[in-house]
Design a protein with these regions (language model features):
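Loop-to-transmembrane alpha-helix initiation sites
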Residues: 14-17, 62-70, 89-93, 136-137, ...
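Transmembrane alpha-helical segments in multi-pass inner-membrane proteins
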Residues: 192, 198-247
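Transmembrane helix-bundle core of multi-pass membrane transporters
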Residues: 4-13, 84, 92-152
Length: 272
């Protein structure tokens, strides 16, 4: 592999943005997986599709409208689940289909699918701008700082919600915070893998890491390592062979999962 591609400015932006998104998705995704909200990222991504379509129709930067729609959608999922005693999976399914339906209707008003729409559907990390990179880094830093500051409360409410309530932890507020941060993370990640494959970044590295049977911190580190590896190698391979970055990244993640499953089946993973 020629190292010349590493000298390109657009590749620097793509790799920096990709690594930041990989770390962010791994951390937020781990909390979602442990809370049995694995499909949450998919639902928010599909709902944000409606926001993207709305932004394109209104002539506004699509990600701004997508952020607004995704946050509102995330809060709606939580409210439906809590108030109407509907299971998390069911409320997620409702939101997922609603977002896609709304997006398709809005797109039909704007004259159909365009190149811009396809870039959001399938990702366009190699085209990320300087402003996008700065925004991604700022949001990643802000969310990680919040998680570090509230680490114990978030972790406690994730593993034992009832006991956390007894201990005086504001579980409901923590839940809304997690949902809010997840919504921000989803839209931020759309530029990397697009709306259609976003859940892969949240779920696959974490499922792979969990199979190693380590503690929470070790699992998070393993997940981030796998995610960063898939993103970096995926971006480089996609450029060299002129193939889609999103699909390449996801296939690499699936490959790591398959290797881990093989190692586990062979009894080579220690249980700690």
């Amino acid at each position: 592999m020629s190292f010349e591609i590493l000298t390109y400015t657009f590749m620097h932006r793509a790799l920096i943005s990709g690594i930041a998104i990989a770390i962010l998705c791994s951390v937020i995704g781990l909390f979602l997986v442990l809370r049995r909200y694995s499909l949450f990222g998919d639902a928010i991504a599909h709902s944000s599709f409606g926001g993207i379509a709305l932004g394109l129709l209104a002539g506004v930067y699509p990600l701004w409208t997508a952020y607004g729609v995704s946050i509102i959608s995330a809060l709606i999922i939580t409210k439906i689940k809590d108030r109407y005693n509907i299971s998390g999976d069911a409320s997620i399914a409702v939101l997922l289909s609603s977002g896609i339906a709304a997006g398709l209707v809005i797109i039909s008003f704007s004259g159909g699918f365009t190149i811009d729409i396809f870039s959001f559907l399938f990702g366009s990390i190699l085209l990320v701008s300087v402003n996008d990179t700065v925004l991604i880094l700022a949001l990643t830093g802000a969310i990680l700082i919040v998680i570090l500051l509230l680490y114990r409360q978030i972790l406690y409410s994730t593993f034992n919600e009832e006991q956390a309530k007894v201990s005086g932890i504001p579980v409901e507020k923590i839940n809304y915070l997690i949902i809010f941060m997840a919504g921000i993370t989803v839209v931020t990640s759309i530029q990397l893998v697009g709306v259609l494959l976003i859940s892969a970044l949240f779920v696959i590295p974490n499922v792979t890491a969990i199979m190693y049977g380590k503690g929470f911190k070790q699992t998070a580190i393993i997940s981030m390592s796998f995610s960063v590896f898939s993103v970096v190698i995926g971006i480089l391979i996609s450029y060299i062979f002129d193939i889609t970055p999103a699909g390449t990244i996801v296939l690499l993640s699936i490959g790591l999962l398959g290797i881990t499953m093989g190692i586990k089946s062979a009894g080579l993973l220690s249980k700690n």
